[in-house]
């Protein structure tokens, strides 16, 4: 067995988020033994000293604003969800109960967003060396499963009502409750509404901080969906109030709104599965990333390109870049880093520089993944 010399260049300076990796030199390697670093870069990598920005004494104002909005909206949502459950029970309306189930999806998503904002501030450990961001995904999966159970029970009760026909609905109570539901959803929408268009016209993190917080934006979209459902319940309440013989509208609305609730959770479940399966996250195109890297002067080829996400909004990248023999490794590294961060704003990037070899053309391990 041939001997291998390992030069360990790992520097774990306290608070730093940019690390030199390990350089291996082997006689059997097809890569020439040149001193080229493997560098891991995070979003803070442009600032190697963090003394100027103490996250403990100067909390992120964007996260603080998002947290306040979510606290207000979740409190309103919880109070009225309980009110809708009581109102739906008194009115004997499954449609209102289904609307309450949709409020449960809103409340769960807000709690998950609040939890994500809190847990993302926790420091990484030797065991959880990427941090605790995936806890948000597990919470989302749990909330989806619980909502499915509640919706399934309501659909079962609606089927029983249509079959038996032995039920009465108090139209006045249903009308009052559904009217309040519309008003409350409008209030929650105003509480979560953010000014600005959410577009970035620059590549700096200062520009991105002016964009809408993704957690608040997701909660706002949930509330808009629930507002539309509440309007539907209000229309059904008017029909039943003036035409009590049309009481079957209530279980029919339950079916329709259950589909809406399940449709909402399916989009969440799709995102959860994509993160857990470490698929390429939404908003990041694999081919675009590959072409962007190949367009850098001095880059001849690349391989081992992997793009995944810690959470839905935190993409991660690792790649090996093969450069020309006369190319400046540090210059290529800087350009590649800046272009990737400017376009995709990766949470963490690991870029390893190698010298290009003709053997890479026929190496199966250097080929890209299937379409």
Curated annotation (Swiss-Prot):
GO terms for biological process: intracellular zinc ion homeostasis; zinc ion import into lysosome; zinc ion import into mitochondrion; zinc ion import into zymogen granule. Keywords: Antiport, Cell membrane, Cytoplasmic vesicle, Endosome, Ion transport, Lysosome, Membrane, Metal-binding, Mitochondrion, Mitochondrion inner membrane, Phosphoprotein, Transmembrane, Transmembrane helix, Transport, Zinc, Zinc transport. It holds the Pfam family Cation_efflux. The chain crosses the membrane at residues 70-90, 100-120, 137-157, 173-193, 220-240, 249-269, 304-324. The keyword Kinase does not apply. Zn(2+) 1 binds at residues 102, 106, 222, 226. One of its GO terms (molecular function) is metal ion binding. One of its GO terms (cellular component) is transport vesicle membrane. The keyword Repeat does not apply. Phosphorylated at Ser-295. Phosphorylation at Ser-295 prevents localization to lysosomes. Dephosphorylation of Ser-295 which triggers localization to lysosomes, accumulation of zinc into lysosomes and lysosomal-mediated cell death is induced by TNF-alpha. The modification Phosphoserine is found at residue 295. A motif (Mitochondrial localization signal) lies at residues 47-50. Induction: Down-regulated upon zinc starvation (at protein level). Up-regulated upon zinc intake. Up-regulated by dexamethasone. It catalyses: Zn(2+)(in) + 2 H(+)(out) = Zn(2+)(out) + 2 H(+)(in). It comes from the Eukaryota. Belongs to the cation diffusion facilitator (CDF) transporter (TC 2.A.4) family. SLC30A subfamily. This is Proton-coupled zinc antiporter SLC30A2.
